[in-house]
Amino acid sequence: MELANICNATIAKGIAVQKDSYGGYGVYIVDPGALVGCNDPKLGGDKIELLRVSSVFNVKNLMEAMNALEGEYAEDGQRAADMFKSIIGSSIEELSAVSETCLLVYFMMVIYLMGEQGYAVPMKISRYIDTVLLGTTVNNASNCIESMLIHYEHVALFHELDNNLQKLHKTLISKMPSKKNYSIELLRQIYSATVSRVLEIPQELHEENYMDNYVVTPSLVPILDYVNHGDKTSRNAYYDVDRRKGDIILYLDLTVVNPGKLKPNTEVLITYKDIEDSLAMITKYGFDPANYTTTGTKIFSCTFDKMYLSTNKFDNEIDIRNFYQWFSINPSLQFVLNSENEWLINDSLAEFERLLVPFATSSQRNEHYWIYSDGDDARKRFMEYFDIDEVEDEDEAWAQLETQFKWFESSENDLMPFPPCVWTVKSKFLKEKEATGYELEKVIQNKLENSRALYNETTNQFQAYLENYLDYRIDVLQEYSPEDTENENAVSQLIARELSVLLKIRDRINNNKSIFLNSEDKKYAKLPLLPTKNVERPPWLSEGDDDFDQD
């Protein structure tokens, strides 16, 4: 294929890129017989080279390729190299906080637009953009972000994605030499194609000690980026780096497959990670593989609807949304698919125990219960905490502080940049009659860890609250009609996945089955959490000010 020639890729006989079952493309073994006997004893005899790629695109080598134009195209090359340096150099400050993958998207956009404006750009990069990044339709979250924010407004991940897209677009418009209003749809296309294809490639820092000195770099690897992801039971290949040449190589793994027994058109599949994150898959690729049982781990995370948490108070008194804000508790649940193909709540996470804290209220109301107070008691505690009891105008200092924390309470931000002085607890666990702040949370957490009776009572109260939430959320999801998001696959896939998981959890509750993983396997305590939402800026910060401190 033309792209292989342009990008210096070598493809083994019997291998081809073809349409896959999800509407995209994959790499297939169309003629297994062509691979029989191709294993090289010098490589250990347990693998066959299917693909070798010399041209890899990442931030570093895109910069190098554009700088190299100075010596390749005389004046045109110098002009293009200077323009690229100018655009990127002036963009660094605006893009200092974005990920390296976002920078890769930005570099690709700049190179593409420079080519459109008549600047000399490297042919292989230009062809890759035209053929792959612009020629691949990926119905992932970035291509339907408006609909995703309508249906999942409460999920911080999609606000973060939207903010990244807006930041890249705004920077692009302001830095390109032609002040055209470049379409954000073009950016979304390149963004969606890039994030769905990017691979984490290890890069050597010091040749003499490679294993201890390398970084993982988000990279686009032509042809290899057509290879799809499989679980541990279907994976039959893996990629590696040729340390001597720097090439990326795709190997057929002969420890798991025998090419002589493969059927024609067997798909080549690699495993990216041991953790299969349904939400991440839908966000990046626009689809979620079916349930399966593997030696890996499949998870699904969802964020509570914060309006529900605020309007449906626990015990008719505790505003769960407000409580989670003040204690900076991530308002998300993580579900794990166990070996019996059942979705269960991951209660091994430290953050899950923090979710339980507001529910650690005795039903008898005589042992311990939470109290919210933003009046004189809160004022006293704030003044003591900030040591501002000797200011000239204490009333004015308190008024300013109260205005600020009230603004945060009503904002969409999940984290509060103040100590939780408005929340106190009356408890027989404490020597004092009343305590407050993060120390208070630690006391309750310690009691939860060391009192099985209290833990059971707390989880029961949490489950009762969750059961009502499930009824509410399932009703919302079941009102969804696919026509609402026609051709926006990521939205419909995410709704279907969340609905499926929540229905299974509710069924377990109705059948008096445990909904908790209750595993002693330490790997479950380290699974990744969803990000928290912190996108609104306080009105007392001007546009040029640094973001407020959330620590």
UniProtKB/Swiss-Prot annotation:
Gene3D superfamilies named in the record: set domain protein methyltransferase, domain 1
Major place of residence: cytoplasm
GO BP annotations listed: methylation
Enzyme superclass (EC): transferase
UniProt-annotated location(s): Cytoplasm, Cytosol
InterPro entries according to UniProt: Ctm1, SET_dom, SET_dom_sf
UniProt-listed SUPFAM superfamilies: SET domain (SSF82199)
Domain SET as annotated: residue spans: 46-273
Substrates-to-products reaction catalysed: L-lysyl-[cytochrome c] + S-adenosyl-L-methionine = N(6)-methyl-L-lysyl-[cytochrome c] + S-adenosyl-L-homocysteine + H(+)
Assigned EC number: 2.1.1.59
Keywords of this entry: Cytoplasm, Methyltransferase, S-adenosyl-L-methionine, Transferase
Record-level Gene Ontology MF annotations: [cytochrome c]-lysine N-methyltransferase activity
Region ranges (SET-like): 184-288
The record's note on its domains: The SET-like region, although related with the SET domain is not detected by any prediction method.
UniProt protein name: Cytochrome c lysine N-methyltransferase 1
Species, as recorded: Candida glabrata (strain ATCC 2001 / BCRC 20586 / JCM 3761 / NBRC 0622 / NRRL Y-65 / CBS 138) (Yeast)
Gene name, Swiss-Prot/TrEMBL: CTM1
